[in-house]
């Protein structure tokens, strides 16, 4: 529902503009392009419907821009961490290679096999590292709950309290996202 907000002076100006151009018009049809903005400016300078429509248009444009930005952020996040599930599935393989190296150290018969296992582990870590995977959790570093999962405490006089005493299972991080915390024992002062 539109209201007629024209005054007699506005109507006269519109009629004069239409007569001057030699074109009779109804509701702004057939007005030359240079007269149309002038007519709109004088007939409805503060039309509430136009102001409301302009506000709705600006809000819709702002919503569109925000949606575009959000979708781009989500896409970037997906691309950045696309390999997360595959890399997480490979972590038990790395654990088994570490266990094979750990338990085969004492056997002379396994020496040649251990060289092959060590080379395989190194190649796998290098390949995964190119995709952003890195190991976390080293003995002697300060215990950090964001990176380490404390499995037990260990009385240690040779290191400060609340440091990683033993790494039971390495943790891994993909770029800034932790895939698995390192399972560690935490030192405490004997007493």
UniProtKB/Swiss-Prot annotation:
One of its GO terms (cellular component) is cytoplasm. It comes from the Bacteria. The keyword Flavoprotein does not apply. Keywords: Chaperone, Cytoplasm, Stress response. GO terms for molecular function: adenyl-nucleotide exchange factor activity; protein homodimerization activity; protein-folding chaperone binding; unfolded protein binding. Disulfide bonds: none annotated. It is found in: Cytoplasm. InterPro entries: GrpE, GrpE_coiled_coil, GrpE_head. GO terms for biological process: protein folding. It holds the Pfam family GrpE. Its main location: cytoplasm. Participates actively in the response to hyperosmotic and heat shock by preventing the aggregation of stress-denatured proteins, in association with DnaK and GrpE. It is the nucleotide exchange factor for DnaK and may function as a thermosensor. Unfolded proteins bind initially to DnaJ; upon interaction with the DnaJ-bound protein, DnaK hydrolyzes its bound ATP, resulting in the formation of a stable complex. GrpE releases ADP from DnaK; ATP binding to DnaK triggers the release of the substrate protein, thus completing the reaction cycle. HAMAP family: GrpE. Homodimer. Belongs to the GrpE family. This is Protein GrpE. It comes from Nitratidesulfovibrio vulgaris (strain ATCC 29579 / DSM 644 / CCUG 34227 / NCIMB 8303 / VKM B-1760 / Hildenborough).
